[in-house]
Amino acid sequence: MATLKQIQFKRSKIAGTRPAASVLAEGELAINLKDRTIFTKDDSGNIIDLGFAKGGQVDGNVTINGLLRLNGDYVQTGGMTVNGPIGSTDGVTGKIFRSTQGSFYARATNDTSNAHLWFENADGTERGVIYARPQTTTDGEIRLRVRQGTGSTANSEFYFRSINGGEFQANRILASDSLVTKRIAVDTVIHDAKAFGQYDSHSLVNYVYPGTGETNGVNYLRKVRAKSGGTIYHEIVTAQTGLADEVSWWSGDTPVFKLYGIRDDGRMIIRNSLALGTFTTNFPSSDYGNVGVMGDKYLVLGDTVTGLSYKKTGVFDLVGGGYSVASITPDSFRSTRKGIFGRSEDQGATWIMPGTNAALLSVQTQADNNNAGDGQTHIGYNAGGKMNHYFRGTGQMNINTQQGMEINPGILKLVTGSNNVQFYADGTISSIQPIKLDNEIFLTKSNNTAGLKFGAPSQVDGTRTIQWNGGTREGQNKNYVIIKAWGNSFNATGDRSRETVFQVSDSQGYYFYAHRKAPTGDETIGRIEAQFAGDVYAKGIIANGNFRVVGSSALAGNVTMSNGLFVQGGSSITGQVKIGGTANALRIWNAEYGAIFRRSESNFYIIPTNQNEGESGDIHSSLRPVRIGLNDGMVGLGRDSFIVDQNNALTTINSNSRINANFRMQLGQSAYIDAECTDAVRPAGAGSFASQNNEDVRAPFYMNIDRTDASAYVPILKQRYVQGNGCYSLGTLINNGNFRVHYHGGGDNGSTGPQTADFGWEFIKNGDFISPRDLIAGKVRFDRTGNITGGSGNFANLNSTIESLKTDIMSSYPIGAPIPWPSDSVPAGFALMEGQTFDKSAYPKLAVAYPSGVIPDMRGQTIKGKPSGRAVLSAEADGVKAHSHSASASSTDLGTKTTSSFDYGTKGTNSTGGHTHSGSGSTSTNGEHSHYIEAWNGTGVGGNKMSSYAISYRAGGSNTNAAGNHSHTFSFGTSSAGDHSHSVGIGAHTHTVAIGSHGHTITVNSTGNTENTVKNIAFNYIVRLA
């Protein structure tokens, strides 16, 4: 056959070596035997790789009938179709996985492991996983686990189980609209977050029943019991034709015994009895009323033997403490015990008045249309804090008792309209109208005390009169005529000289009076004087004493007084009286002092005399109480201490002034008090602050309080607003010396009416100011709680600002930081860190720290400073840092051990083995070769002597001819050795075993706790809620 010529490659055995461009011609090949890589040189002089070891491009189909193993990534630009499964020991990654047959499978590694479908973040951390847990013989379970945020180590899991026909379990189930199911089994239903107007549950059935009077118009709402075998209670709603709609409660295994019900018109029915306010224990069995005392139909209140007890049709009793107090029948109220009507707040231990204008007992007597008051009869009526009784009606009240009627205390008042007359047991009769007797007054008693007596009058002049009324018929007096007696000896002030006065008068004035004067001088009995109002016609007048004419007196001739005129009782002169020729024109005097009317050229004076010179003494040397300017009309009092200038309407006071008690100074319209303060006029009190408490440093309006009251308010300025029924005042509280601006509205809650307001703005001596209500400056309000509102920034609402700051200030820990707490009792505003969720809307600041809404579970955890590359709040399981242990056993040379000696004797082999040997063959014909020979002029440099003589120069060299190919044949055989046997002498001998130095495997046993710990003290971790 033809022989292929060997292909020559440039070769290299060093890994990674590429041929240089200078060693290859275009198209020439080179190979790296280590990398199994082929190279060539292209027409541009570049070295390129051939083959797949370093990549390349295949334009066409490739069929691999075997295993394709990739040690790097596999990138598929187009689609990929496989006829069998795709397996990976690590993972398969792609943007989208789509099943065109509708299935994805996750196979567990064994029957005790989970099958997973994972969801990850971009960094490979877990978002969630769906996994199926190992099945049991009776059920299976698929769980959905969701990681609670990137910064959390906690998870939420949801369970789908095959038991009970299929179950779903989650911590919370939220339905944005409705959760529709036939049955829900829960421990507690919470409706705390429901919107206003929503119901906890609906059972608005739309049953339709045929016919009328149907028996199935029933909606069964609930049935409950407390224990196995306990009473079952049923809650039912019924709506049956011809009957009222009703909600009712029954008992029994089925609704057999109706307990009570409420109809749609509000009426309620109870099967047996009702007890109100009788609870004494948590689960009372004996607080439902005393059946023995109350019967079997009752309403008890407070205790079990007090309330209403049904007796028979139309009759029930009021029962107190087990005893019948009253019976109510269809036609009456019958008291079966002592009846007491009164008002008491402690069951009769003490009694109080009924409310104002209210009665203890009222009888509706207005049915006869009487017009007395409200027409009702009232017993125990509170009128002005006093107990009154009113009997009213258009009939009469009859009192028929054998011994008459006693009124005690003895006061009887008869009233008709606004008129009344009162009879008193002491004989007094008081009447609004005069007492009129239709017949005469006949005094039957015979002693000398019998007669008409008039009590002493209570007022001056005009009391205790005897009056004859006037008439219009013939013979009657025209005007009434009165006789009265009085006196003024006991008057407090004024004239007290008339001990008794007897006077006769009519409606136009007095006729005459006579009186006894009080004794004077050495008199022991006063003299009698009489006075007539008109003319006195007498044949003669004899007067032992003075004769005085009060009115005018007509005398036929002149009256000449030779020694002046002395008028003791006064004189009335209708004409002008002229007094001239003397400075002291007129004197008014008494035994001690006189007052002289004196004039000068320009003034008129009223000047007193010295003491005890009243009748004839000269004027006082210095006193000038009254001066009247004759040229200007000015009036000066007290040496012009007080001057009235009529022309200028000006009053000048040149001295201290005083208005005595109970008198006032009133300023009229547009009047005012002007305290002058100019550069030339320095008002009272002007000066330093330090001098203001000096008693001699006054003010234009000054009050010096020098009182020892324990407690009193002294106002210095007051303004009362009549229409507003309120008063403002400025003053001092004596008990503490504080100054107050005060407002009082209404009365004193007594005689002046109810109080409507009472506020005081108080200036404290220590500099504090007290306001009863809020302080307002512009739009800013300082309220009584200390809050400031209405301002800007933090002062829009200071409380809100402080509350916000207080949460941060109260603790040195930021909100969200774990705080070690040495107690199982958690302080208010904090929570244990147990992995629980929290309401982020209720605690927005905590939500900033934990945006997932889950507080980390710090039980058994320690806090570690976050290393680089680790997420905040990520959890790390416990573990031991990777380390190694060394262990060795000491080397021991156990020496050489000798086995026991035993003689095995001689052993023979079997007698087989005869055989021969044969062979044949030939050698190859190869062997043709040539030799190269050089000739020299001396000894050959190759060391081979070619000639026996010396060759002194190189003659040259050439090859011998190529010849010598030949072959050999051969064959051989051996004779048969025949069958034969051998014997072997073993003999007695021993064996030695060299143990030598050696090592042993060391097992290190486990020891220590279940987890890595350091010395520690257990604290609870708590976190602030905000």
Curated annotation (Swiss-Prot):
UniProt GO molecular function: structural molecule activity
Family matches, as SUPFAM superfamilies: Receptor-binding domain of short tail fibre protein gp12
GO annotation, biological process: adhesion receptor-mediated virion attachment to host cell; symbiont entry into host cell
UniProt subcellular location: Virion
Cellular component, GO, one term: virus tail, fiber
Record text on subunit structure and interactions: The long-tail fibers are trimeric, with a stoichiometry of gp34/gp37/gp36/gp35 of 3:3:3:1.
Additional observations: The two gp37 protein chains run in parallel, the length of the distal half-fiber, with the amino end near the center kink of the fiber and the carboxyl end at the distal tip. The other polypeptides are distributed uniformly along the length of the distal half-fiber.
Function: Structural component of the distal-half of the long-tail fiber. It constitutes the part of the long-tail fibers that recognizes the bacterial receptor. The long-tail fiber of T4 is about 1600 Angstroms long with a kink in the middle that divides the fiber into proximal and distal halves. The thin tip of the distal half-fiber interacts with the bacterial lipopolysaccharide receptor and specifies the host range of the phage.
Annotated protein name in UniProt: Long-tail fiber protein gp37
Organism: Enterobacteria phage T4
